[in-house]
A protein has these predicted regions:
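Rossmann-like dinucleotide-binding domain for NAD(H)/NADP(H)
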Residues: 1-86
Length: 86
């Protein structure tokens, strides 16, 4: 799991066509809001808008993680989750 730029969509299309991967599911895309057109045409690909965290359970976990990061920072600890700049 990761943000869109972590996935090379051209390589993904190639791997799916050659059978190296049997399927893929994406809710973020390499080049912003839209996936490569080839991915839209493939039966073994599921694409959704960026809604992977739209459950109450996930949002509670995210809120707790933020709180733990802030508390850890204030106490001089390493954050639970680090933000890396590209």
């Amino acid at each position: 799991t990761g943000r869109g730029p972590l996935v090379d969509e051209h390589a993904l299309v190639k791997a799916l066509r050659e059978g190296a991967l049997h399927g893929a599911g994406l809710d973020v895309f390499e080049f912003g809001d839209y996936p490569l057109p080839e991915l839209l045409e493939m039966d073994n690909v599921v694409l959704t808008p960026h809604i992977g965290t739209q459950t109450m359970e996930t949002r509670i976990i995210m809120a707790r993680t933020v709180c733990n990061n802030v508390i850890g920072f204030l106490e001089g600890d390493r954050p639970v989750s680090r933000v890396l700049r590209p």
